[in-house]
Amino acid sequence: MTLTRTRRATLSVAGLLLAGSLALTACGNTDATPAADAATPAAVTSIDGQMVSLPASGKPTAVFFFSVGCGECVEGVRSLGEAATAAEKSGAGASFLAVDMDPGESKETIEGFMEYVDAEHVPAAIDEGAALSQRFDVAALSTLIVIDGDGKVTFRATEPDAKTITAELVKAGA
C-alpha cells in the first residue's frame, strides 16, 4: 500500500511538472519576425485595381475589416459607406477602405456585397496573407480602425455607426 501511495505521489508530481513546463513553453513567442511598424506605409491593391496606401498621403483613413459571410458586418460596411459619402459631400480629407479578411471570397462576391450594403463607392481589398490584419493587430471581423496621416491607429471599435466614424476621422485630422 505504501509503495502505491509513493508511486502515485511521484507520478502526480511528475505530471504537474510536465504540465507546468509545457504551459511555460507555450507562453514564449517563437515568431522570429517582428511585426511591421504601423507607421511604415503599406500599399494594397483594391479589387478594382486601385493602389491604396495606408496611411493615405497624410490624411486619416477609416479601415473596416469584414467578410461577406459575416452577418454582423453588414451594418459596419454600410456605416463605412455612409461616412464616406458624408466626407465626400463635406470635402473632408479622409480615405476609406473595406478589407475582406476571407481570402476565399471572390472579387465578384465582394462587389455584390458592397453593392448590397450601398457601399460600392468605397474601395475594397482582400487581406492576402492576413497582411493588414496582422499589421494593425485586428483579430476579429467587424472591426474598424482609424489611422491618422502618420500611420498611428487612433481609434478601434466593433461596428461603429457613421457618425462615430466621421467624428473619429475629424479627431485624427480630417
Indicate where each model-derived feature is located.
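Structural microenvironment flanking redox-active thiols in thiol-disulfide oxidoreductases
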Residues: V74-V117, E128-A131
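Short active-site neighborhood of thiol/selenol oxidoreductases, capturing the structured segment around
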Residues: S53-V74
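N-terminal "domain-start" segment that seeds a small globular fold
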Residues: C27-S53
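Hydrophobic beta-strand anchors of alpha/beta hydrolase catalytic cores
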Residues: A62-V63, F96, L144
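Bacterial N-terminal signal peptides that target proteins for export
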Residues: T2-A14
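Thiol/disulfide oxidoreductase modules built on the thioredoxin-like
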Residues: G58, D118-A119, E128-K171
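C-terminal motif of bacterial Sec signal peptides marking the signal peptidase cleavage site
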Residues: L22-A26
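Short acidic-hydrophobic, aromatic-tinged amphipathic segments that line or gate anion-handling sites
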Residues: V44-S46, P123-E128
